[in-house]
Amino acid sequence: MYQRKIERELRCPLEYGLDIFGGKWNSRIICILFIKGSLRYNELKAEMLDITDTVLSRTLKELMQNNMVERRQYNEIPMRVTYQLIEKAESVIPIFETICQWSKKYLAPDDINNSICGQFLKQDGEFFILAEE
C-alpha cells in the first residue's frame, strides 16, 4: 500500500473528509455498499465495472484503515469474506446525497450517468434507490 513520505498536514476538517471519502473509488465503494449491503469481493468488483483488482484491494484496505468498511471472514470452506459499511461510513451518506442533488442541478442532462451512486435520495428520513428512467 502506498505510504506518504511526508506526513500530510490537515489544516481544516474539510481536508480530513475529502482525504477519507474523496477520490475516484472511495465514494463509489461507500455508495455501493450502502445500497447493496454486505458484499463479497467479486460481487463488489462486478458493481464497480471498470476497477482493477489491485486498485479495489488497495482502496478496501484504505477504507478499513480509516474505519469506514469492515471485512468479515467466515469460518467456512471455501472461505467466505464480505465487506460492509460501518457507522462512520454510513454517516457520510447524507453528504453524498447532497452532492448528488447539487451535481444533478449543475451537470448537463446528457452527462448524468445512472450509476448506482447517483440513485439514492432521502424521503422521510430514509434513503431509497431511484427507479431507472
Regions found by a protein language model. Give the residues of each.
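Beta-hairpin "wing" of winged helix-turn-helix
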Residues: 64-84
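N-terminal helix-turn-helix DNA-binding core of bacterial DNA-binding proteins
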Residues: 8, 12-55, 82
